[in-house]
Each structure stands twice: as structure tokens, then as C-alpha cells.
Regions:
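Short hydrophobic-aromatic micro-motifs
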Residues: 36-38, 88, 133-142, 184-187
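Glycine- and Gly-Pro-enriched alpha-helical subdomains that act as flexible
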Residues: 190-192
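Active-site neighborhood of divalent metal-dependent phosphoester bond hydrolases
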Residues: 94-120
Length: 192
């Protein structure tokens, strides 16, 4: 059985005024006896909401980061302070590059804090291919692009060897959770 809770997004507070919102995303789910987080939003607000919902971050077994943009990894520092043991599954490319958005007047850096990866390297599992996390949870690492990318990607850039290039979402990780009557797919930003 799957138990899934949205911890942070940009709309959750309309249901409960005590829950915080932000441009970002974080899910908590339980399956196969595991407590997991998928993304951490842009800040530590996910932890406020987890506490209000009775979810204990220190008991999380696995954290999956969907990609290297800070609206999904911004709460990582807080998570690492609160949870001392969970493995963190992420694409091998998520912390490798600098990511920029041009949705505003000036370009903004939306990269994850790579110093956390360096400091806590032993906690990270770098994905280069799909991975079976548990009997019912599959991590799907993005690899082939044989379709048009979403229109929103036109505002995103990646810096490779000092040169800006169009963002190709090679760092995305989606979740597939098998349940009794089908599957649940979590794709945080769906850049690909």
C-alpha cells in the first residue's frame, strides 16, 4: 500500500492555513516499509509542514532528488542536519553543472548547493541508470530524448566548461511506484 503526502508546493496552504507554500516541491511517501522523501522544495519550509503533519524527518530511510534545480533541493542542508542516515539518490549530473533561468529580468542561478554534495558524499548514491529502490519503487534516470521538450525549457540554460548552453534535462529522476491496481508516476518538473 502507498501512503503519499505533499509536503510543499505552491498551492497546499489553501487546504490548511498553517501549512507553508513556496515555488518548489516535496513529497513524503511510505511503501514497502520504507519512509521516503522525493525532493525538498526551495527552503526548509518542507520541514515545518512535515512537523505539522506528524511526519518525522529523522526517520526517513531514503531521499530521492528529482534534478539539480534548487526549488527541489533547497531544503537539503536542513535535511542533512535533521536526518543523519538516509541515503540520497540523485542523478550523477545534478550537482555537476551550473543551472540558470531567464524567466526574469536578469538571469538567476538555480543550481543546487554543490558544497553539500562534497561534504556529505558518503550519503549520496549517484544514478547513471534506472534503479530498483524496493520491490515496488523504481527510480527512472532520464537518458534519451526522442520527443519535443516542454516549452518552459526555453528559459533554462546550463553552464558547461564556462559556456552557456540550452538546458537538456539529463539530470532528471522520476519515480514509478507499483500499487495493487496499477502504477503511480512522480515526475517533479517534467522538464523532459
Amino acid at each position: 500500500m502507498l501512503d503519499l503526502t505533499v509536503l510543499i508546493d505552491n498551492n497546499a496552504a489553501f487546504l490548511d492555513k498553517e501549512l507553508l507554500t513556496e515555488h518548489g516541491l516535496s513529497f513524503y511517501f511510505r511503501v514497502d516499509g520504507l519512509a521516503c522523501l522525493y525532493d525538498l522544495g526551495a527552503s526548509d519550509k518542507w520541514l515545518n509542514n512535515a512537523n505539522k503533519l506528524g511526519i518525522h524527518a529523522e526517520e526517513v530511510d531514503h531521499l530521492i532528488l528529482s534534478h539539480g534545480h534548487k526549488d527541489h533541493t533547497g531544503g537539503l542542508s536542513t535535511f542533512l542536519q535533521v536526518n543523519k542516515s538516509a541515503k540520497i539518490f540523485v542523478s550523477d549530473k545534478a550537482f555537476k553543472y551550473k543551472y540558470l533561468t531567464y524567466r526574469h529580468e536578469k538571469p538567476r542561478d538555480i543550481s543546487s548547493d554543490s558544497s553539500l554534495f562534497a561534504k556529505y558524499a558518503d550519503r549520496f548514491v549517484l544514478l547513471t541508470e534506472d534503479c530498483l529502490l524496493s520491490p515496488h519503487v523504481y527510480l527512472i534516470h532520464n537518458r534519451v530524448f526522442e520527443h519535443r521538450l516542454p516549452v518552459g525549457n526555453q528559459f533554462l540554460r546550463i553552464v558547461v566548461d564556462g559556456e552557456e548552453k540550452p538546458y537538456i534535462p539529463h539530470d532528471e529522476v522520476a519515480l514509478v511506484i507499483r500499487i495493487d491496481d496499477g502504477i503511480v508516476i512522480l515526475s517533479a518538473c517534467s522538464h523532459s
